Amino acid sequence: MRLLSIEIAHGVNYLMTLTLFSSSLFYRILLMIKNLKNGKPFKAPKYAYNTSEIYVYCPEAQVEAIRSVLSNYEIKVHFNDYSLVNLDEKIITHYENIHLSDNQREFLVTATELGAWVEPLVSYLDERFGYTEVSLLKSSYFLHQKAFSILSTKRTQRAKRFIDISSALLLLLLTSPIILITAILIKLESKGPVLYRQSRTGQYNIEFNVVKFRSMRVDAEADGAQWASKNDSRVTKVGAFIRKTRIDELPQLFNVIRGDMSMVGPRPEREFFIKELEQEIQYYRFRHAVKPGLTGLAQVSYPYGASLNDAIWKHKYDIHYIKHHSTFLDMKIFLKTIKVVLFGLGR
């Protein structure tokens, strides 16, 4: 009888294990089908992001322009190499595929059939380095709606809005002592209002008034709008500290609650400067496709700076964020921002 009980127990355990395995396998199959249905590409193999060389197939007229851009990367680049026979662990990329010759297209199809990793050059650089090479962008990059799910998925937008409101209310509660102390210190140090409002360009190019703690003298822009510099003489002593720790941004939590801003997104800029920057930076206004953020990928990935080159780099991270937006990415950026606030690593 005891032996029978043991056998039954073993049988039950086996069936449970088999059931769990089957369920897991069934779930994975459903996930694969879902990914295929949604048009999501399979993830690149690990070697794709560790390789020291890549192959680029593009129109001959674009070779020098691409070579110039890729010279800033520590990658050896081969252009339109048709002598390539061994495709094992080779990274094959293409650029402006609609303008490729028939021979180039056939080569890329054959390379795919033989197991090479083939993908658009900009997408490859984007995935590998964590920012978008805006100098190589064409309008077609933005026309794949599935790649920019934050723009087209209402469920994603509603979830983000719920998280924004919840986080902003919680942060206001937790930081209320800091907000009160900061307001007192600003008032004690210099004459003028504790808060100031400034027009910024938000989602869909609609302007709104952003609220911040005043960190500069009252007459800081008596001579007109100017870029803030690293050691700006207009910044007060209290202002220098709250800018370094980003405490000056805390009143923008009210902008988040009101719906002007999000907790995470590209930082809002003034229209005066946007008009200058869009003359130098491709697709600069695309950052306005989403709500501006209290913090963003650019702010936790790139040091503080106010030059044109700094603006270009921040735009690279902003475009990457918009394309790859997820709740997980927002959480990651937010946690990195907390480190900046606690240790003053930002400015």
Model-derived segments and spans:
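Short, contiguous acidic/charged loop-to-helix segments that flank catalytic cores in large enzymes
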Residues: Q226-K230, I242, Y321-H325
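N-terminal hydrophobic signal-anchor/signal peptide
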Residues: R2-L173
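A short, structured surface patch at a secondary-structure boundary
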Residues: S229-K291, I333-T337, V341
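Short, glycine-rich, amphipathic interfacial segments at transmembrane boundaries or analogous
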Residues: L125-D126, T132-E133, Y196-R234, T295-K314
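Alpha-helical membrane-protein architecture signal
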Residues: L151, R155, A159, I163, ...
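Bateman (tandem CBS) regulatory domains
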Residues: L143-A147, S166, D223, D232-K237, ...
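C-terminal terminal-structure detector
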Residues: I281-R347
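A hydrophobic, helix-centered structural microdomain
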Residues: F26-L30, R155-A220, N255, K332-R347
